[in-house]
Design a protein with these regions (language model features):
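N-terminal nucleotide-binding beta1-loop-alpha1 segment
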Residues: 1-20, 25-26, 77-78, 219
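Conserved N-terminal catalytic core of the sugar/cofactor nucleotidyltransferase
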Residues: 2-5, 13, 31-115
Length: 251
């Protein structure tokens, strides 16, 4: 199994903080937020290589960071991938980036664990990985607990087996408080469909769009994430994450 960390966006909503620094390299509780993600992955046996896909603007920054981080997590194997984009206007999009890495690194024969570099989890993801490895496709789900709040996310409903039965991005009339979040496991059977999805002219941005397309073609399982999940999309959530993870670091 290999892993892809999505870190190629330009985070325009966080300007000016992200004008000269990639969002996943912004500090949360004293360290780059991407390290919170990777420290979590460091506990999983069987992850061969972690591919961090970024853009041309920030590739050198990520490479410098990776060179230093590698000393502290020597058991992890990293590769920084430049998707070639130079601005928000010519970005490949998250699904485009996934396909770019799969194609360039010949990963079609490997199961993939995919996570956004700006999604933070307060608890271990080991349970997700163990569960997901027994499926063709699994997406992490989080109960936001509020019908108004869920309108900002990809909203799902599931059956008694945890299989997605409905998926709607930012619904006006949500039918549950479950959000599909940017943590995915795809087996080799599913990875081959990423190219099919893009070739049909579907939206290359927002990784949840692929799940929305996939669940009508294959059973997509869900795994409910416990603890705290934060999608860093604004200065407010960045500040909230800093407070939460400072408390966690003290424990």
């Amino acid at each position: 199994m290999n892993s892809i960390i999505l870190a190629a966006g330009y985070a325009t909503r966080l300007y000016p903080l992200t004008l000269d620094m990639a969002k996943p390299l912004l500090k949360v509780a004293g360290k780059p937020m991407i390290e919170w993600v990777l420290d979590n992955l460091a506990n999983f046996p069987g992850v061969e290589t972690i591919y961090v896909v970024t853009n041309d603007k920030f590739t050198s920054d990520f490479q410098r960071w990776a060179d230093h981080y590698q000393f502290r997590q020597s058991q992890l194997t990293f590769k920084i991938i430049n998707d070639g984009s130079k601005s928000d206007a010519d970005k490949l999009g998250a699904i485009g980036d996934i396909n770019f890495v799969i194609t360039r690194e010949n990963l079609s024969e490997s199961d993939l664990l995919i996570v956004a570099g700006d999604n933070l989890f307060s608890q271990s993801l080991a349970g997700f990985v163990e569960y997901a490895k027994k499926t063709e496709a699994t997406v992490a789900a989080y109960d936001v607990g509020d019908l108004e709040k869920i309108k900002r996310y990809g909203n799902i409903t599931v059956d008694s087996d945890g299989v997605i039965t409905r998926f709607e991005e930012k619904p006006e009339k949500p039918q549950s408080t479950l959000a599909a979040i940017a943590l995915y496991y795809y087996s080799t059977e599913v990875i081959s469909l990423v190219t099919t999805y893009l070739a049909a002219g579907n939206n290359p941005d927002q990784p949840g769009r692929f799940v929305q397309w996939l669940y009508t073609r294959k059973p997509v399982k869900t795994f409910l994430i416990k603890g705290k999940w934060l999608d860093i999309g604004s200065k407010e959530t960045l500040e909230e994450a800093d407070k939460i993870f400072r408390k966690l670091a003290v424990k």
